[in-house]
Amino acid sequence: MSENLIIFNAKVVTPLGFSARKGKEMAELRILEKATVEVVDGIITYVGPNRGEVRDGYYHHFWHYNARGKCLLPGFVDSHTHFVFGGERAEEFSWRLKGESYMSIMQRGGGIASTVQATRELSFIHLRSKAEGLLKKMTAMGITTVEGKSGYGLNRETELLQLKVMRSLNKDEGVRVDIVPTFLGAHALPDEYKERPDDYIDFLIRELLPVIQRDSLAEFCDVFCEEGVFSIEQSRRLLTAAGDYGLLPKLHADEIVPLGGAELAAELGAVSADHLLHASDAGIEAMARKGVVATLLPLTAFALKEPYARGRDMIDAGCAVALATDLNPGSCFSGSIPLTFALACIHMQLTVEEAITALTLNGAAALNRADSIGSIEVGKKGDFVVLDSDNYHILPYYVGMNCVNTTIKGGMLYPSV
């Protein structure tokens, strides 16, 4: 199919800009009725009123798409997922219903450790096949760019294997989503390094970072900076070393306790800090000053029955807030964009407009891609979502139900049915 596309009779709904929108800016959307969007070789070349040339047959080398007044949004950017893994952890859901916490399950050998074992047992082919199946479900909900993390290997071989699976999927023209790889070797402490976290950080720096740089396997380095996992100092040391190897810093921060991860993210100039359920006021203010994107994951708080991150407070403090699914096999086995919208609006007090910005332009900024995706503007990729309605407020209103009619990736059409 050609990557030349003309979309007409669309209701364009988009944030604007080539960087993250902060604070009050998040509520500002451009809305164009009866609009045309032109895509040439996968790149947007025109956004504006309907053109007579469409009727006159000027675009005879283009695919034509009549949006019939439906909303046309930027493709959704899911900037925090763990979609490459082996096994499943369905039994943990029942354990949590009986009162066990995420950390108590992890400490008794469940949680991440059980996924690590299952992932280490899978071949490249089986790991890739499982990941591709999850991606297909996610793209049907309008996701056109997704971040993926390693972190279920915790050894040299399997950490690299996860990253190579993502690279393989990214090169496959049949996969309808761009994948942004993140190295999360510091996701948990493996049994081989039990009670030796400093030695494990040394191992990651010595054995993995040079290979990841050499083979261009990741763009970011993430760390689970949390009490009982990796300390502030250990996180600082790894992320600083990763920067020397060309990887940009991200953090799982202040998810379980207010450890100071948000403050560390600001100190290091991290691209994003994620979770932030227990981020302090000082941490939020520091992130706002330094331009660290606050990536909030409402599906995880929902699944764990935890308090939601203070999205409203973060926006009011001037933060750039992004939303993501945190799809993973344990704490949140869901890639539901519709439910993410609903929970963010209901429990984090985001407006619908702010939530749209959070799942498009600010999600792109959390992946260092706001210059090329995340809004419908000339020069950006032709990644779009067509809703089933001319009213974008259905995004949270359809609680958990998919309201995406068609996903358009690089100018190519993919109906959601």
Curated annotation (Swiss-Prot):
One of its GO terms (cellular component) is cytoplasm. It is an enzyme of class 3 (hydrolase). It comes from the Bacteria. GO terms for biological process: L-histidine catabolic process to glutamate and formamide; L-histidine catabolic process to glutamate and formate. Its EC number is 3.5.2.7. The keyword Cytoplasm applies. Its main location: cytoplasm. Pathway: Amino-acid degradation; L-histidine degradation into L-glutamate; N-formimidoyl-L-glutamate from L-histidine: step 3/3. It is found in: Cytoplasm. Gene3D superfamilies: Metal-dependent hydrolases, Urease, subunit C, domain 1. N-formimidoyl-L-glutamate binds at residues 152, 328, 330. It catalyses: 4-imidazolone-5-propanoate + H2O = N-formimidoyl-L-glutamate. Disulfide bonds: none annotated. Its cofactor is Zn(2+); Fe(3+). Fe(3+) binds at residues 80, 82, 252, 326. Keywords: Cytoplasm, Histidine metabolism, Hydrolase, Iron, Metal-binding, Zinc. GO terms for molecular function: imidazolonepropionase activity; iron ion binding; zinc ion binding. The keyword Chloroplast does not apply. Zn(2+) binds at residues 80, 82, 252, 326. It holds the Pfam family Amidohydro_1. Catalyzes the hydrolytic cleavage of the carbon-nitrogen bond in imidazolone-5-propanoate to yield N-formimidoyl-L-glutamate. It is the third step in the universal histidine degradation pathway. This is Imidazolonepropionase. It comes from Bacteroides fragilis (strain ATCC 25285 / DSM 2151 / CCUG 4856 / JCM 11019 / LMG 10263 / NCTC 9343 / Onslow / VPI 2553 / EN-2).
